[in-house]
Amino acid sequence: MHCPYCNASETKVIDSRLAAEGAQVRRRRSCNSCQERFTTFEVVEVVMPRIIKSSGKIEPYDNDKLRRSILLPLQKRPITIDEQEGMISRIEKRVRQMGEREVSSKVLGEIIMSELKTLDDVAYVRFASVYRDFQDIDAFHQEIANIRPNEK
């Protein structure tokens, strides 16, 4: 690791600790040349599978696109940023755990819907209406009935 102050290549680790709930390693370093101290963070590089669109086109996974598609139905809902970020992390984890190099957008959409369903019914129906291309009010009624099958 090069020193950010003098660009020397010889540095030593003074302290290492887990950070971000174990997702990162925080290291305090000292430069052997100028004795300045600095902090680095080490994270695992995660490779997400490519997404196969319904048209057959293959695109790289896009975290921003996932985030936008989830945040839109969650607008004006009582969901905290931490809950939103947690859901995005769970979705990405489920996709990675599939162990595939390519995943269809249909599978990704179903994972998103299952996560939204457990988080917020209204956001789930909003997302489902676009994802499943609801054409009339009956489609909404049917989806709501599926959420609450025992209620009349």
UniProtKB/Swiss-Prot annotation:
unnamed ZnF: 3-34
PROSITE patterns, A to Z: ATP_CONE
Database matches in InterPro entries: ATP-cone_dom, NrdR-like_N, RNR_NrdR-like
Keyword annotations: ATP-binding, DNA-binding, Metal-binding, Nucleotide-binding, Repressor, Transcription, Transcription regulation, Zinc, Zinc-finger
Entry cofactors: Zn(2+)
Cross-referenced Pfam families: ATP-cone, Zn_ribbon_NrdR
Molecular function terms from GO: ATP binding; DNA binding; zinc ion binding
Domain annotation ATP-cone: ranges: 49-139
GO biological process: negative regulation of DNA-templated transcription
Note describing how the cofactor binds: Binds 1 zinc ion.
Job of this protein: Negatively regulates transcription of bacterial ribonucleotide reductase nrd genes and operons by binding to NrdR-boxes.
Family: Belongs to the NrdR family.
Protein name: Transcriptional repressor NrdR
Species whose genome carries this gene: Psychrobacter cryohalolentis (strain ATCC BAA-1226 / DSM 17306 / VKM B-2378 / K5)
